[in-house]
Amino acid sequence: MATKFPKFSQALAQDPTTRRIWYGIATAHDFESHDGMTEENLYQKIFSSHFGHIAIIFLWTSGNLFHVAWQGNFEQWVAQPMKIKPIAHAIWDPHFGQPAVKAFTKGGASYPVDITFSGVYHWWYTIGMRTNNDLYNGSLFLLILSAIMLFAGWLHLQPKFKPGLSWFKNNESRLNHHLSGLFGLSSLAWTGHLIHVAIPESRGQHVGWDNFTYTLPHPAGLQPFFTGNWSVYASDPDTSNHIFGTSQGAGTAILTFLGGFHPQSQSLWLTDMAHHHLAIAIVFIIAGHMYKTNWGIGHNIKDILDAHRPPSGRLGKGHKGLYATITNSLHMQLGLALASLGVITSLVAQHMYAMPPYAFMAKDFTTQAALYTHHQYIAGFLMVGAFAHGAIFFIRDYDPEENKNNVLFRMLDHKEAIISHLSWVSLFLGFHTLGLYIHNDTMIAFGTPEKQILIEPVFAQWIQASSGKALYGFNTLLSSSSSIATKAGSSVWLPGWLEAINSNKNSLFLAIGPGDFLVHHAIALGLHTTTLILVKGALDARGSKLMPDKKDFGYSFPCDGPGRGGTCDISAWDAFYLSVFWMLNTIGWVTFYWHWKHMTIWQGNVNQFNESSTYLMGWLRDYLWLNSSPLINGYNPYGMNNLSVWAWMFLFGHLVWATGFMFLISWRGYWQELIETLAWAHERTPLANLVRWKDKPVALSIVQARLVGLVHFSVGYILTYAAFVIASTSGKFG
């Protein structure tokens, strides 16, 4: 008899119902639970899958390069980056009528195309690419790299090339290699690319495979490096009237500390970025030589952790026991990695617009909006994933004996205090923020807008002023012309910073007022509530007063049978499930705020945001409703325009989102009855009953149906907003 799916679970493979298929898919990546899985095999499988993951990423980016080179307008865009819209790829669609063909033929193309809002053109241009040939070369290189990665993944599954368990758990060696090799050397290599290729290209000097071996990136060559006269590399930077991509106004400096932005491209100075990457390379290469391996010198991480014991003794044993706990728990490691990556992704969203690294991207408003929204949503999913794996760690990997009286033990011991404080903060923020908004709504509704409660964010304004913003008149630190910091700053470090922070050509430290104060606290409410749900889920994952034996039921269970009241919806998975709704809610507020404020700034109409953002009807009417007109009018019986595809996607996103509720509200019994009725009808219908099934159809479990509902809710929510952001922004700014 042929073995049935899933091969990794004998018990599931013998299940006579459709549960076999759905549970098989659900547990396909839960390697720990597979039949005959050993710890060593688990590590080897995960290690090999990393190579596959990297191969997919390289294949995807290779495809981007290839399609732009083949069907895009990169060379035309390079000639006029401010005037021409960058093309992602051609559209072939048999449904297109003549009006559609006409509407989507744009960006200088002679056929229907998709415009890209990803910023890749700006990135490729900034790093020195100028021709379609450059793009094809990059595409081919990544394709070869992708094939090598696939081979490496396969190779590391072969008996001779499978690393042993001790290799995976050798933390010091791994840290040294990752810090020095992965971060250090790759940063050094990137510095090399910027200095040898990107900076010369930005000054109108082409450097390619044909001439890079004998083209000096700096007229003085390596002499200043070996003689210690490093300041030569910083002297003669590009001037403020430098035309990007030409020699007009160009300097010779390669490593600078100018601060601020290139006046024409409104992006960070390339020479500043080269300096930044060189500094990071040096720091990480040094960091990668800190840990003790084959030679008896350097730090031992276990010793460091064990030494972290607060001297008063009131905080228990500190970090003692963490070394073994983290080393032996993949979920703990994944949780830490996801949390770090989540924070850095949100920082990327912030810095990509406040300090754009790519030439001319600051003037492509739709790209700015799309990238901010994209990175904030990704950050949200990474953060909730971190807590999910933190909870799985507590259920599957936490050893109370190993962690006696240390920081993990004490977190669990004090969980009531932690959870109740988060609850108190969430309640305080929620009631006060909503109270202020509703008061203001009522005052506007009764025709007395002057009675609104409007609070100036004075502390935030003071922080902006101390960073150099002169607008508020605080006259403190960098915003005071007589302070030591200002005097040092204007001559020694970052002379361009003060000009940039007080310029209205960028999004650095935007002026803030009462509307910002309110939405800031609404976002704080969302963050604290999401955190409350996630922290409670992880800290109660092993057990609670209501259900002390919870850990024995695993990560996701619906209830402990009908006979034990109150045990439904309290698994760690349910906490994750609830948190995703709050995470989406919060990031919705974050992106609404960012987008509306920027839309009004770009339109030269910032008063609209300042006046309408202090009450809820203002948000609904002047942001959502007002900006949805290109989506509501995207197509009609009389014709369409080039936003019609976004209008359709806006509609489709709502549909997907609404489908989620069908699974979230009606539970398993409803579906089971429906399935049995349909099966009965099928078996009695001529012709249809010739089609039989081997597996008895049964409804999804409660947990699975919730997942299906959650996925539809999330995908629909994000798709709807993505269409809204792109259509409303590109509809106004072309």
From Swiss-Prot:
<dbReference type="GO" id="GO:0016168">
    <property type="term" value="F:chlorophyll binding"/>
</dbReference>
<keyword id="KW-0004">4Fe-4S</keyword>
<feature type="transmembrane region" description="Helical; Name=VI">
    <location>
        <begin position="369"/>
        <end position="395"/>
    </location>
</feature>
<feature type="transmembrane region" description="Helical; Name=X">
    <location>
        <begin position="643"/>
        <end position="665"/>
    </location>
</feature>
<keyword id="KW-0472">Membrane</keyword>
<keyword id="KW-0150">Chloroplast</keyword>
<keyword id="KW-0793">Thylakoid</keyword>
<feature type="transmembrane region" description="Helical; Name=VIII">
    <location>
        <begin position="517"/>
        <end position="535"/>
    </location>
</feature>
<comment type="similarity">
    <text>Belongs to the PsaA/PsaB family.</text>
</comment>
<keyword id="KW-0157">Chromophore</keyword>
<feature type="binding site">
    <location>
        <position position="559"/>
    </location>
    <ligand>
        <name>[4Fe-4S] cluster</name>
    </ligand>
</feature>
<dbReference type="InterPro" id="IPR020586">
    <property type="entry name" value="PSI_PsaA/B_CS"/>
</dbReference>
<feature type="transmembrane region" description="Helical; Name=V">
    <location>
        <begin position="330"/>
        <end position="353"/>
    </location>
</feature>
<feature type="transmembrane region" description="Helical; Name=IV">
    <location>
        <begin position="273"/>
        <end position="291"/>
    </location>
</feature>
<keyword id="KW-1133">Transmembrane helix</keyword>
<keyword id="KW-0812">Transmembrane</keyword>
<feature type="binding site" description="axial binding residue">
    <location>
        <position position="662"/>
    </location>
    <ligand>
        <name>chlorophyll a B3</name>
    </ligand>
</feature>
<keyword id="KW-0934">Plastid</keyword>
<keyword id="KW-0560">Oxidoreductase</keyword>
<dbReference type="GO" id="GO:0000287">
    <property type="term" value="F:magnesium ion binding"/>
</dbReference>
<dbReference type="InterPro" id="IPR006244">
    <property type="entry name" value="PSI_PsaB"/>
</dbReference>
<feature type="transmembrane region" description="Helical; Name=II">
    <location>
        <begin position="135"/>
        <end position="158"/>
    </location>
</feature>
<dbReference type="GO" id="GO:0016491">
    <property type="term" value="F:oxidoreductase activity"/>
</dbReference>
<keyword id="KW-0602">Photosynthesis</keyword>
<feature type="transmembrane region" description="Helical; Name=I">
    <location>
        <begin position="46"/>
        <end position="69"/>
    </location>
</feature>
<dbReference type="GO" id="GO:0009522">
    <property type="term" value="C:photosystem I"/>
</dbReference>
<protein>
    <recommendedName>
        <fullName>Photosystem I P700 chlorophyll a apoprotein A2</fullName>
        <ecNumber>1.97.1.12</ecNumber>
    </recommendedName>
</protein>
<keyword id="KW-0148">Chlorophyll</keyword>
<feature type="transmembrane region" description="Helical; Name=IX">
    <location>
        <begin position="575"/>
        <end position="596"/>
    </location>
</feature>
<dbReference type="GO" id="GO:0015979">
    <property type="term" value="P:photosynthesis"/>
</dbReference>
<keyword id="KW-0479">Metal-binding</keyword>
<feature type="binding site" description="axial binding residue">
    <location>
        <position position="654"/>
    </location>
    <ligand>
        <name>chlorophyll a B1</name>
    </ligand>
</feature>
<keyword id="KW-0603">Photosystem I</keyword>
<feature type="transmembrane region" description="Helical; Name=XI">
    <location>
        <begin position="707"/>
        <end position="727"/>
    </location>
</feature>
<feature type="binding site">
    <location>
        <position position="568"/>
    </location>
    <ligand>
        <name>[4Fe-4S] cluster</name>
    </ligand>
</feature>
<keyword id="KW-0408">Iron</keyword>
<dbReference type="InterPro" id="IPR001280">
    <property type="entry name" value="PSI_PsaA/B"/>
</dbReference>
<feature type="binding site">
    <location>
        <position position="670"/>
    </location>
    <ligand>
        <name>chlorophyll a B3</name>
    </ligand>
</feature>
<keyword id="KW-0411">Iron-sulfur</keyword>
<dbReference type="InterPro" id="IPR036408">
    <property type="entry name" value="PSI_PsaA/B_sf"/>
</dbReference>
<feature type="binding site">
    <location>
        <position position="671"/>
    </location>
    <ligand>
        <name>phylloquinone</name>
    </ligand>
</feature>
<feature type="transmembrane region" description="Helical; Name=VII">
    <location>
        <begin position="417"/>
        <end position="439"/>
    </location>
</feature>
